[in-house]
A protein has these predicted regions:
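C-terminal helical subdomain
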Residues: 178-182, 197-245
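The beta1-alpha1 cofactor-binding region of Rossmann-like NAD(H)/NADP(H)-dependent oxidoreductases
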Residues: 37, 57-67, 100
Length: 254
C-alpha cells in the first residue's frame, strides 16, 4: 500500500510544486516548512485533492525535527517517500568577502538539515519494507561558478551523501535519488539576494529558466517508476544554460 509523501521546504519553489503534483495524484502528504502561514494555506487548498498534514519546522533544529516527525499522526506517519527539499543559497560574494553567517546558514540548512531529516525518518522507511528518498541537489555540486563557494560545497555534500545512502541501503528496498536542477525561476534568487526583486529578476533576463513545476514533474517521475528501477542522479538544466568555459586571468587585466 502506498504511504505518504513527506516534503521539507514545502511552502514555495520545488517543494510547493511537488506538493501540488503529488496531491493531484491523490497521495497523502506531510508538508513541512518554516512559514506556518504558507503551510496552513497550502494544506487547506490541497486537502481538497488529497489528505494533507502540515508541520511548522525549521530543519536546522535537530530537536524540532525529531519531535515533529515522532508526532506525525496516522495514517500520515507511514512515510514512503521523503523529499529533502529544504535548502537555500545566500549571497554571491567571493570567499574572501562573503559574510560568514551566510556560510553558517547554508551549512546548517543544506547539510545538517538534510542529515537530521534523513536520519530521523529513515528507520521508519526501513521498517516499512521500502520507500524512496529524494534529495534536492544542484548543478553547483559539479560545475563551479564565482560566488558559489560554500553553496556549491553544500550541494556537493548532498550529491555524495545520496550516493552513500544508496550504498548503506542496499538490500533494504529503498531507492535514493539526487535531483540536481540548474537555473530555475523560483524564490531561490530572491532569497539569495535578500529580497532584492530587481537583482533576483535579472538572473533570468533574456532566457527561459526551468520552472518549479518542471522539477516537480521530474521528482514525481522518478518516484513513479517501477520499484526495481533506481535513478541515482539526475542533472537538469534549461536549454539555454550550460557549463562555463574555464576562466583564465590575463596579466593585462591587472
Amino acid at each position: 500500500m502506498a504511504g505518504s509523501v513527506l516534503i521539507t521546504g514545502a511552502s514555495s519553489g520545488f517543494g510547493e510544486a511537488s506538493a501540488r503534483k503529488f496531491a493531484a495524484a491523490g497521495r497523502p502528504l506531510v508538508l513541512a516548512a518554516r512559514r506556518k502561514d504558507r503551510i496552513d494555506r497550502l494544506v487547506a487548498e490541497l486537502s481538497k485533492q488529497a489528505p494533507c498534514y502540515g508541520i511548522e519546522l525549521d530543519v536546522r533544529d535537530r530537536g524540532a525535527v525529531e519531535t515533529a516527525f515522532a508526532n506525525i499522526p496516522e495514517p500520515f506517519s507511514d512515510v514512503e517517500v521523503l523529499i529533502n527539499n529544504a535548502g537555500l543559497a545566500l549571497g554571491l560574494e567571493g570567499a574572501h568577502e562573503v559574510d560568514l553567517d551566510y556560510w553558517d546558514t547554508m551549512v546548517d540548512t543544506n547539510i545538517k538539515g538534510l542529515m537530521y531529516c534523513t536520519r530521523t525518518m529513515l528507520p521508519r522507511i526501513v521498517a516499512r519494507g521500502g520507500g524512496h528518498v529524494v534529495n534536492l541537489g544542484s548543478v553547483a555540486a559539479s560545475w563551479p561558478y564565482p560566488g558559489s563557494n560554500a553553496y556549491g560545497g553544500t550541494k556537493a555534500f548532498v550529491q555524495q551523501f545520496s550516493r552513500n545512502l544508496r550504498a548503506d541501503l542496499l538490500g533494504k528496498n529503498i531507492r535514493v535519488t539526487c535531483v540536481e536542477p540548474g537555473m530555475c525561476e523560483t524564490e531561490f534568487s530572491l532569497v539569495r539576494f535578500e529580497g532584492d526583486e530587481s537583482k533576483a529578476g535579472s538572473v533570468y533576463d533574456g532566457m527561459q529558466p526551468l520552472l518549479g513545476e518542471d522539477v516537480a514533474e521530474i521528482i514525481f517521475w522518478v518516484t513513479s517508476l517501477p520499484a526495481h528501477i533506481n535513478v541515482n542522479q539526475l542533472e537538469v538544466m534549461p536549454v539555454n544554460q550550460t557549463w562555463s568555459p574555464f576562466a583564465v586571468h590575463r596579466d593585462s587585466e591587472d
